């Protein structure tokens, strides 16, 4: 299972909204858990100023409650600390935290799958930005987009 987040802008004074200092985005973060095929198993939307390491625990719990065959979890450096300990100690799973080494762009093994899933979402007009007032509606739109992708055969084309 792979977990990552994406920060998106939102216009509305909705349920949860915050400023992500590192990415300079005022809006929300989408946490998703996907399998190695890029299929979405869990979604959690929250204010962008909340830490990934804490909010990642929520999406991990949602996904792992339904999945019995997961052997490990991959995430990036934003998930060190609380998330790492929660999954390793609470769920008794191997956790692989990937990190960059050196300068420039590098394709990280397995991590590109979750990034590809986010790029598929950007092909959906409704998900290019967070237009929803509450986070549950935003989560529902992500699930609908992933179902649409499955029905069409793994692409939005």
Annotate the PLM regions.
Residues 1-94, 145-146, 155:
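Polybasic low-complexity intrinsically disordered regions
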Residues 49, 67-137:
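Helix-centered, glycine/charged polyanion-binding patches within enzymatic domains
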Residues 26, 132-136, 142:
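Intrinsically disordered, low-complexity segments enriched in glycine/proline and serine/threonine
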Residues 137-157:
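C-terminal domain-tail junction helix/linker
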């Amino acid at each position: 299972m792979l977990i990552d987040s994406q920060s998106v802008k939102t216009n509305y004074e909705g349920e949860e909204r915050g400023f992500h200092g590192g990415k300079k985005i005022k809006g929300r973060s989408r946490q998703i858990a996907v399998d190695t095929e890029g299929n979405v198993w869990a979604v959690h939307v929250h204010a962008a100023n909340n830490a990934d390491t804490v909010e990642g625990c929520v999406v991990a719990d949602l996904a792992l409650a339904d999945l019995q065959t997961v052997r490990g979890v991959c995430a990036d450096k934003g998930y060190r600390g609380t998330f790492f300990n929660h999954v390793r100690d609470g769920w008794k799973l191997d956790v692989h935290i990937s990190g960059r080494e050196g300068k420039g762009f590098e394709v990280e093994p397995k991590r590109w799958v979750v990034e590809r899933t986010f790029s598929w979402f950007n092909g959906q007009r409704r998900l290019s930005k967070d237009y929803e007032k509450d986070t549950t509606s935003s989560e529902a739109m992500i699930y609908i987009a992933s179902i649409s992708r499955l029905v069409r055969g793994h692409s939005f084309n």
